[in-house]
Regions:
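Active-site lumenal/periplasmic loops and adjacent helix-entry segments of GT-C-fold
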Residues: 102-170
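Membrane-embedded, hydrophobic transmembrane alpha-helices
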Residues: 1-87
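Generic serine detector
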Residues: 28, 38, 89-92, 147, ...
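Internal/C-terminal transmembrane anchor helices
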Residues: 88-109
Length: 170
């Protein structure tokens, strides 16, 4: 349950930051979740290369919170609420937010596991190693199970599970 709570809070931070940035730069908020997540993955990648992957996760969380703080100071709470209302009126942004919440709730209820050789199992091996070790999986040259997985998939999973035990469904 804590995994779900953390994921939903992170999603709130992410979407709120997108709404505030969209207000600041007069962009559609639907354009921002992918670049913001990509930027988070770049930060995690650079910190992972340096051996500080968990520090990178904290840096991403602090950066998202900083956008909220700047937004609350610059636009006041009423302005941030207006930015949220404008963001919620954009169908693609609402679809992103609603779809993410739906997937998280679905996985929380069903809690799928890596039990067979399917796409879900193949995709999940590398993120599992990254989350459990707090480092890239290539640090162990003996274990080649996840050598085919791109680092970004592992890092985006790590962003949503940087602390605590690994949960396959999360």
């Amino acid at each position: 349950m804590l995994h779900l709570l953390y994921a939903l809070v992170l999603l709130l931070l992410l979407c709120g930051a997108c709404a505030i940035l969209a207000e600041r730069f007069t962009l559609s908020p639907a354009l921002l979740p992918l670049p913001v997540l990509s930027g988070a993955v770049v930060v995690l990648y650079l910190c992972g290369v340096a051996g500080f992957l968990r520090v990178g996760a904290v840096a991403v969380l602090l950066a998202l919170a900083a956008v909220w703080v700047v937004g609350l100071v610059q636009y006041r709470p009423a302005g941030v609420a207006d930015a949220w209302k404008r963001a919620a009126s954009v169908p693609s942004f609402t679809l992103f937010l609603g779809g993410a919440v739906f997937i998280w709730l679905l996985f929380c209820v069903q809690q799928p596991m890596f039990t067979q050789w399917d796409e879900f199992t193949a995709w999940g091996l590398a993120p599992k190693m990254v989350v459990e070790r707090g480092a890239f999986y290539v640090a162990d040259p003996v274990n080649l199970k996840a050598s085919f997985t791109y680092p970004a998939t592992s890092l985006i999973t790590f962003l949503f599970q940087p602390f605590g035990p690994w949960a396959e469904w999360a």
